[in-house]
Amino acid sequence: PDNINRSSDGNYWLAMTGMRTPAYDLAMRMPGFRTRMVKRVPPDEWLYSNINNGSVIKFTAEGEVLASYWDKSAENHPAITSMREHRGYLYLGGLMNNRIGRIPLPDADPTWDSSDSYWGPKA
């Protein structure tokens, strides 16, 4: 997980990031290979997924997942490291990305737009 932000409805957004390898992708398409791997290779040498599919999860304070958005192709928004809800949209960014993503959130508060919305008014 990387970066947690508040949503306009009082819940939270979480960015997930990592990198995926061609060897892992190949192993996931070969069940026999995976079976042999877990029988013959020590666990600390197994292939693990480090998925670079951009993903953002919305969840409650209790940890219940309410929504998830991700880029299955890992082409548009790989390795998302940040997100911020602003005026009815969820903006996505990543350290290695050359673009900013924007997802419309139909149920979001369209007035949620400043530090006062996010943190509350200054005392």
Q: What are the language-model segments listed below?
A:
Residues P1-A123:
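Sequence-structural signature of mature extracellular/luminal beta-sheet repeat domains
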